[in-house]
């Protein structure tokens, strides 16, 4: 499918209580980002993690950076070691780091120092249930989330799971940044609809940057 808006300029969409959508912010960097995703996955392959309750997640995941988000029978945690390879997670590519810092600065977080990037791969039908990002030691640091490939519906709620949800269309190259009052808001991705994108074929990638260790 051709992108009819390939020449459109990036633009910001501030939302209530802190989140900002940076539309098309990652568009020009997308090809390099996807090459680097493939390089990371060649070292730490995508896998469908199993939650502590025994549920196999529909989204395939891997990590890069000093710390990687993973699961075990005790819960969710960050670890410097990939439990599948028993090696350190791949280093965060420079393209990832540069984009993340530019996006964080554009959204008002110039001091953000990401040390973890969770890479999610969505096939048609894959989803991410409502959840809070609360496994990080310093919740003052924001979340930076990059969308690549097929479009998806991003659900963004409040501090309670049953708070009303905003449903926002995220397209190729969009970046969402949230922190402050909204840092612990529930969020998720609705089941991905089938489609085709010239850079990612039948899937969507998401890069989620966090500060998972203590800031030096």
Language-model region placement:
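Non-heme Fe(II) oxygenase metal-center motifs and adjacent flexible, charged/small-residue loops
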Residues: 1-216
